[in-house]
Structures are given as structure tokens and as C-alpha cells.
């Protein structure tokens, strides 16, 4: 639950900051503060923070700080693209190397045949590369308001749909001692 809150909390803060707090600058500030609080809470409570969360928060702190200092919203808008490309490369390379990173993230929930982890790595890499392209299209061609709405009402449902589409692979290839 804490992990979910730490992922969604900053997005909610950004959305609220944009629509109720005066625009993209305030939204960025609220998201930065919320992200630091969330990652700190994860560390204090769980005594660990995932590598992906560290990467995500670092990119956010850099792009968000540049946005606040420069007043140019482009930097916060390219943050998702940068993250999606980084994550895409991580999942792609881990699949190529036959050492799927996604296995370490999910094996406490589901145990799969090794080749299924590799397939899932490639699919996840493709998803992140796709999301990078979509983010670039949206932020470059639409208003700040449309981009913010896309981040909340587009990215979250598309991610959920992607996860649901992976269920047949997971269910077909799970090992007997798997939790799902």
C-alpha cells in the first residue's frame, strides 16, 4: 500500500497543484515535495527504496528543479520521456542478458519459468518505449492542461491495461508455488 501511495501521491499532488494551486510551477513544487516525503517514508518504514524509485525521484528532482529555476515547463514535461527511455533500456538489456530485472521486482508475488520473465522484460521495455513516444507527442502538440490530464487520466489507465494484458502470460507460465 505504501509503495502504491508513493507512486500515485506525487501525481495527485501535481494534478491538484496544477488545477487548484496556480499552474505548472506550483504543481512541480508540490510534486517535488510529495516525492521526497514519499521516498523518505518508504525508507523509514520499509528500510529500503527500490532502484526504480531512486532513479525516478532523481530524474524528478533534476527536471523539477530546472523547471522551477528556469520557469520553463519543458523540463518537467520531458521527465516522463527520460524515465520511460531509461526504464525501457533497463528492461530491454536485462532481457537480452537473460537476467530479467522485472523478475526481482515481481518474484515475491509471482514465480515464473525463466523464459517467461524474459518475454515479460521485452514486453515491458516495449511498453516504456511506447509511452516515451506518446509523452513526446502529447507535450509537444497540446496545452499544459491537456498534458497534465493525460498524465493522470491517460497514463494510469494505459499502464493498468498493460498490466492486465500480461495476466495470460503470468497465469499460463506461473510455477506451482506462485502466489497468484
UniProtKB/Swiss-Prot annotation:
It is a multi-pass membrane protein. HAMAP family: YciB. The keyword Manganese does not apply. The chain crosses the membrane at residues 25-45, 49-69, 76-96, 118-138, 150-170. This is Inner membrane-spanning protein YciB. It comes from Rickettsia felis (strain ATCC VR-1525 / URRWXCal2). It holds the Pfam family IspA. Disulfide bonds: none annotated. It is found in: Cell inner membrane. The gene is yciB. Plays a role in cell envelope biogenesis, maintenance of cell envelope integrity and membrane homeostasis. Keywords: Cell inner membrane, Cell membrane, Membrane, Transmembrane, Transmembrane helix. Belongs to the YciB family. The lineage of its organism: Bacteria, Pseudomonadati, Pseudomonadota, Alphaproteobacteria, Rickettsiales. One of its GO terms (cellular component) is plasma membrane. Its main location: membrane.
Amino acid at each position: 500500500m505504501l509503495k502504491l501511495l508513493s507512486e500515485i501521491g506525487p501525481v495527485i499532488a501535481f494534478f491538484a497543484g496544477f488545477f487548484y494551486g496556480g499552474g505548472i510551477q506550483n504543481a512541480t513544487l508540490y510534486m517535488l515535495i510529495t516525492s521526497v516525503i514519499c521516498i523518505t517514508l518508504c525508507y523509514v518504514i520499509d528500510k529500503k527504496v527500490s532502484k526504480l524509485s531512486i532513479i525516478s525521484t532523481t530524474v524528478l528532482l533534476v527536471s523539477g528543479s530546472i523547471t522551477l529555476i528556469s520557469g520553463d515547463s519543458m523540463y518537467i514535461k520531458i521527465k516522463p520521456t527520460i524515465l520511460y527511455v531509461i526504464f525501457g533500456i533497463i528492461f530491454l538489456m536485462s532481457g537480452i542478458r537473460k537476467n530479467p530485472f522485472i523478475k526481482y521486482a515481481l518474484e515475491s508475488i509471482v514465480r515464473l519459468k525463466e523464459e517467461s520473465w524474459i518475454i515479460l522484460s521485452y514486453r515491458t521495455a516495449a511498453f516504456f518505449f511506447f509511452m516515451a513516444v506518446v509523452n513526446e507527442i502529447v507535450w509537444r502538440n497540446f496545452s499544459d492542461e491537456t498534458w497534465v490530464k493525460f498524465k493522470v487520466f491517460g497514463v494510469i489507465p494505459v499502464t493498468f491495461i498493460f498490466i492486465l494484458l500480461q495476466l495470460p502470460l503470468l497465469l499460463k507460465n506461473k510455477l506451482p508455488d506462485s502466489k497468484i
